[in-house]
Amino acid sequence: LQARQQTVSALEDKIADYKRRMADAVSRKKMDTKPTDPTGIEPDDHLKERSSLRYGNVLDVNAIDIEEPSGQTADWYTIGVYVIGFTLPIILKALYMLSTRGRQTVKENKGTRIRFKDDTSFEDINGIRRPKHLYVSMPTAQSTMKAEELTPGRFRTIVCGLFPTQIQVRNIMSPVMGVIGFSFFVKDWADRIREFMEKECPFIKPEVKPGTPAQEAEFLKRNKVYFMQRQDVLDKNHVADIDKLIDYAASGDPTSPDNIESPNAPWVFACAPDRCPPTCIYVAGMAELGAFFSILQDMRNTIMASKTVGTAEEKLKKKSSFYQSYLRRTQSMGIQLDQRIILLYMLEWGKEMVDH
């Protein structure tokens, strides 16, 4: 029955589409037969006299889905499977072109769908080698992206989440991360995060039973314990699609970190993805680490905003865009960020990073 209903609704949609096309064709014919207005006003314009502006492009909104206005969520599983199907060299070279040289690549190819080609990436069809292109769409502000379409932002997000170790080895980094001192920050990550985990956490008030050894009572106040609690919360909030992607990635080469203390953990953000990559969104503290980096980018923009006039506060208002959009995009993937962890990072490393 369901299948029949679907067929019927599909046919109804088709009929409606044909009716619309016929109406368009009829109205177009009418337009063609109308004599042109000597004043240069378009026949269906409601103004009596011509506007001082010339007529611009016709924006076609047929493709826009009004039911989903709040920013599109990507189909991460399909995107992940597509990217994992390529050889590592072409993925990393494309990442280099879209992060280190990103500005230039995007500027030169705006509004088109580009193909990356590399000799390592080919497919055999009946014994004939054919290049296997990696397609990336370079949208303008107006274009609507399909859920499984790769854009520079989505590409950086998925590749950073899948291959942080390879990015670390080759030291591929976004210019903006270089400016906020990322390489200095990750130089001794293992020691840095270990010290952080052993610090006392201001947000925990452990119920220490009388007679508990002092050492254990002290351990219960550490940041590590707060992160364990956060991990429990995250474990209950999984989205099926992202789980599927993580399982698929685990069966291949990818090296996504399973713990914030992994040596490659901060490298997930080396190419400044605009959200937390889906492969490590359920690792306690990872999404918040990305938010910490985006705050640093905003602070750097505030300090560097020499072109804008006004007080530092006004500049801050203008510039807090990275952090806001990072939060919005990451939370659209189905998790809430823990602001307290971001605060812990700021208290621990904020001053050091800004001074650096």
Swiss-Prot record:
InterPro entries in alphabetical order: Hanta_nucleocap (IPR002214)
Biased composition (Basic and acidic residues): 26-35
Annotated stretches, region: Homomultimerization: 57-82
MF terms in GO: endonuclease activity; RNA binding
A GO-annotated cellular component: host cell Golgi apparatus
Function: Encapsidates the genome protecting it from nucleases. The encapsidated genomic RNA is termed the nucleocapsid (NC) and serves as template for transcription and replication. The nucleocapsid has a left-handed helical structure. As a trimer, specifically binds and acts as a chaperone to unwind the panhandle structure formed by the viral RNA (vRNA) termini. Involved in the transcription and replication initiation of vRNA by mediating primer annealing. Plays a role in cap snatching by sequestering capped RNAs in P bodies for use by the viral RdRp during transcription initiation.
Name by which UniProt lists this protein: Nucleoprotein
Organism field: Puumala virus (strain Berkel)
Lineage: Viruses, Riboviria, Orthornavirae, Negarnaviricota, Polyploviricotina
